[in-house]
Amino acid sequence: MKYLPIDSNLFVKNRAKLAERMMPGSLAIFNANDVLPSNADGTMAFRQNNELFYFSGVDQEESILVLFPDSTVEKHREILFLRETNEEIAIWEGEKLTKETAYDTSGVKTVYWVQDFHKILRSIIYEAETIYLN
């Protein structure tokens, strides 16, 4: 464990502060940092994008946070996308967040697997007047 667990209320408050400062009709997308190769056989230690961690507490590669406070669909106001996990991934790469543990960590109620990102984004992006990208 890199650090002691952080109360998810901190991340809920951080997202609420951001939502207050966003322009009306705005959508914000925060992407995880990439896993960088060190050579042909290995990768460097993963370090999460600061903004994604600040707003969600998620410290996992291939994660995306979408904030859309003015969405007409309540469940699309905060969405977290994670890499789908299974027992084999846990053995070879280490334990990853499930949808339940992601909610416990971040306080984001709507969690999808990252392979659904384009489908979900396509359904909500037309409502947005402004888009923020990290």
Task: For every predicted segment, state its role.
Residues 1-134:
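A composition/biophysics-driven feature that prefers long, compositionally simple stretches
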